[in-house]
Amino acid sequence: MELERFRVGLTPTVFYIPGFITDEEQTQLLNHIYGASGSKWKTLKNRRLQNWGGMVHEKGLVPQELPPWLTKITAEIHESSGLFPSAINHVLINEYHPDQGIMPHQDGPAYFPVVAILSLGSPVVMDFTPHLRLRSGDGYISKDQSPCAESCAPERDSFSVLLMPQSLLIFKDDAYSDFLHGISDSPTQCYNQVVNEAEALAYSNEEDSRKDGDKIFHRDQTRVSLTCRLVPKVRKNLFRF
């Protein structure tokens, strides 16, 4: 796969691959996810999730083998992207109802700085906003203390990506370290500023409309996402180093 042709937006380390899996593969994944034991689900305030691959700790991963159906899809992502130095070993599966989202956040330091998110079910808009600390020189400085120069401002602007079902979003490096990413909890999503406009226009149904010039769609299904990552440090026993 020539990943460069899937790059979107002005931040050079964000890639959006539409139709990464087929309808049949999406159905198979959903069957596996909802066929898992009820105890596998953890319910949070704004979503519920499944954790696969083991427990992530600041000192590394206490591993648990991925099931074959996850090994298969993560191997495809690993081989297609060419961005992970070794096999993906951790997957978080999140389920969102139409009125649920996730606050802007940054993934922890335990992970290799590449994230691959496979989307199933309802489309949604993911927003990226610059971190309060922007990279400058040898370290991080406060955005308030030293605003980004005009020449680099476009790379630090907020942006959004429309995540269609069966698509794969990959972001790394600056997009990983210098931006927060999140999803609005509104069932009505605006896609005026998405960087993959062509894909946004390809999505249509009778519920879509324009309000005061805004391009919007209504989330009417459950969204499921697979967040696939690599934890480089693997600990067979957390208390032995």
Swiss-Prot record:
2-oxoglutarate binds at residues 223, 229. Induction: Accumulates under a salt stress. Reduced levels during cold stress. Seems not influenced by heat, drought and abscisic acid (ABA). Disulfide bonds: none annotated. SUPFAM superfamilies: Clavaminate synthase-like. It is found in: Nucleus. Disruption phenotype: Faster germination of seeds under cold, salt and abscisic acid (ABA) treatment conditions, but not upon dehydration stress. Reduced survival rate under drought and heat stresses, but increased resistance to salt. Enhanced cotyledon greening after ABA application associated with reduced transcript levels of ABA signaling-related genes (e.g. ABI3 and ABI4). Binds 1 Fe(2+) ion per subunit. Residues 87-232 form the Fe2OG dioxygenase domain. One of its GO terms (biological process) is negative regulation of developmental vegetative growth. Its cofactor is Fe(2+). Keywords: Abscisic acid signaling pathway, Dioxygenase, Iron, Metal-binding, Nucleus, Oxidoreductase, RNA-binding, Stress response. It is an enzyme of class 1 (oxidoreductase). It comes from Arabidopsis thaliana (Mouse-ear cress). One of its GO terms (molecular function) is C5-methylcytidine-containing RNA reader activity. It comes from the Eukaryota. Fe cation binds at residues 105, 107, 181. Belongs to the alkB family. Probable RNA demethylase that binds to both N6-methyladenosine-containing- (m(6)A) and C5-methylcytidine-containing- (m(5)C) RNAs, thus being a probable m(6)A and m(5)C eraser. Involved in responses to abscisic acid (ABA) via the modulation of the expression of ABA signaling-related genes (e.g. ABI3 and ABI4). Acts as a negative regulator during seed germination under abiotic stresses (e.g. salt, cold and ABA). Positive modulator of seedling growth and survival in response to drought and heat, but counteracts tolerance to salt. One of its GO terms (cellular component) is nucleus. Its EC number is 1.14.11.-. This is Alkylated DNA repair protein ALKBH6 homolog.
